[in-house]
Each structure stands twice: as structure tokens, then as C-alpha cells.
Amino acid sequence: MEASYFIETIIKIVVIVLIFSALAGIGTYFERKVLAFMQRRLGPVNVGPFGLLQVAADGIKLFTKEDIVPTNVVGRIFKIAPVITAATAFMAAAAIPFLPSFTIFGYEVHPIVSDINIGILYILGIMGVGLYGPLLGGMASANKFSLISAARGAAVFISYEVVTGLSILAPIMMVGSLSLIDFNEYQSAGITSWIVWTQPVAFILFWIAAFAETGRTPFHLIANDHEIIDGFGTEYSGMRWGLFFIGEYANMFFISFVISLLFLGGYGDGSLLGALGLLAKVAFFFFFFLWTRAAWPDIRPDQLMWLCWKVLMPIALINIVITAIVMM
């Protein structure tokens, strides 16, 4: 039993890494297409039918590019920083149930690496550790733009980690568990049982904080092209830069799964329709990340901090108090 469980876990880890690494590349294709559509352009069209092979071309380019390490960088930290970003993104996925359980060849498969009873806390903790990727990469790069990016990243991520944690306290109080599977079961009665209806404020707060956690527009301060070039990634090239890129897009997919499971019923009763519904919700939230980049400008760092500490955090605290009073 222990050997089969170990083998199953290894297979799950490999499948998650392979699928979401590929989805990171595919996500860039859809991002280019969405941005092009909204800006009245064509996007990728030349490499393969409808430009679909552009992803493969970009992958080959990254693998074959020279791995340049500038002279004055702090070598070991510079090299390990991209690994931290990619590794923590996939580590956070261990507590996410991507689909309902299903049976194949008489063997029941649970599409989650580990259903730990502190799943949400684990995910938030690992995402917090992921901050060290851009932070160390920027500090070790011996580049003023990278250093500014690292400072911005530390301020943004640490601040919005607080908002993220406070926003989900109210739903946790209602469900009485930190497991995402328990959250799904709590909402399995149907669309009327979704937590978003009873906790709309928590949903909005968590969704806003998700943009800061993933470093996406309008909170794209750590790699703001017109201010600090590519931010912490300015001195990186080849697959080291690619690891930062994979970590960012994998986080977008994972946070979309978490939002869908926390607030929008997840996969419901575990049926095929529920599984397809979960994937549709994830696709919508991923599209929303792309749409926001096309529609919104970046905001200033001081505006971002003002929004966090003077608007979102007080609202989150008030929401917790109101939820506690209602539940008494």
C-alpha cells in the first residue's frame, strides 16, 4: 500500500509539472491573441496554423539561448532565484484538488497530491516563500533597475499577503476547515450554496489581492517595462528567465483554481459536468488576467500601498467582525 501510494504521488507530481509547464507556454499564446484582438492586431500568425507553433518556437529559443551571468552579480543567489520562483509555484499546487476523484482501470485516482487539513494555509505560506525568487534575483543582479524591482516586490507581496489572509478568514469561519476539498463539499449542493453569495466582499478582496500576488497588471510594479525595464529579470536570459516566466503563469493558473474552489463551488458534486464547470471557471479567471492587462494601466507604488493599507485591509477586518457577529 505504501509503495503504491508513493508511486501514485510521484506520478501526480510529474503530471502537474509537465501539464502546467506546457500551459505556461500555451498561456502566452492566448495572451498574445487576446491582447492583439483588443488592440486590433493579429498576434502570432506566421509560425504554424493560426500561429499555434509560436509556443514551440519560443521554447526552442529559450532552450538554445546562451546562459549569460554578468560579472558583478552574486553568482549562487543569482542562479538559484529563478528555481525558487518555479519550485514554489508547483509546491503550492500540492494541496489543490484539480478535479473530482475518478476511477480508471478499477483504480480510484484522487487528483490532488496531498489533502492536508491546512491546505489553504499551506498554499498561502508557499506563495509567501515564492517572494524570495524575485527579491533575491533583483538584489543579486548588480543592477539598479533590478534592485528597485526587488524593493517594490517585497513591499507589494508582503502587504497583500496580509489582505489575502484576512480575506479568507471569514469563509474559513463558515466552513470550519482549511482543506479545499472541504470547501468544495460545503458548496456541493448547487450554485445557491456557493460562498461567493454569502461572502461577496471576501471574494472581491481575494481577487484583487490575487493580482498583486501574481504581479499582474494593474499591479505590475516589479517588471514595469516603461520604468524599470524587465525589473528583477533584466539581467536574466535563456532558461533562467524562462523559470521566472513559468512560475508567473503557473501561479496564474493555480490561483484561478483556488478562487474557483474557495468561492465558486469548485467541481460541485464530483460529476463530469462539475469537473468541466471547474475548468470553465479557471479559464474565465485566466482570461480575466489577460483582459485586465489589455484594459488597465499600471498604478503607482504609493497608490498600491494606499489601496492595501487604507482601503482593503479595513474592509477585510470589518467583514471578519460582521461574519463573526452573524455566526454567533
Curated annotation (Swiss-Prot):
Catalytic activity: a quinone + NADH + 5 H(+)(in) = a quinol + NAD(+) + 4 H(+)(out)
Entry's localization field: Cell inner membrane
Disulfide bonds: none
UniProt keyword annotations, A-Z: Cell inner membrane, Cell membrane, Membrane, NAD, Quinone, Translocase, Transmembrane, Transmembrane helix, Ubiquinone
GO CC terms: plasma membrane
Gene Ontology process terms (BP): aerobic respiration
EC numbers: 7.1.1.-
Molecular function GO labels: NADH dehydrogenase activity; oxidoreductase activity, acting on NAD(P)H, quinone or similar compound as acceptor; quinone binding
Topology term for the membrane: Multi-pass membrane protein
Listed transmembrane segments: 10-30, 80-100, 118-138, 155-175, 191-211, 243-263, 272-292, 306-326
Principal place of residence: membrane
Functional summary from the UniProt entry: NDH-1 shuttles electrons from NADH, via FMN and iron-sulfur (Fe-S) centers, to quinones in the respiratory chain. The immediate electron acceptor for the enzyme in this species is believed to be ubiquinone. Couples the redox reaction to proton translocation (for every two electrons transferred, four hydrogen ions are translocated across the cytoplasmic membrane), and thus conserves the redox energy in a proton gradient. This subunit may bind ubiquinone.
HAMAP family attached to this UniProt entry: NDH1_NuoH (MF_01350)
Entry similarity comment: Belongs to the complex I subunit 1 family.
Binding partners and assembly: NDH-1 is composed of 14 different subunits. Subunits NuoA, H, J, K, L, M, N constitute the membrane sector of the complex.
NCBIfam families assigned: PRK06076.1-2 (NF004741)
Record-given protein name: NADH-quinone oxidoreductase subunit H
Native species: Sulfurimonas denitrificans (strain ATCC 33889 / DSM 1251)
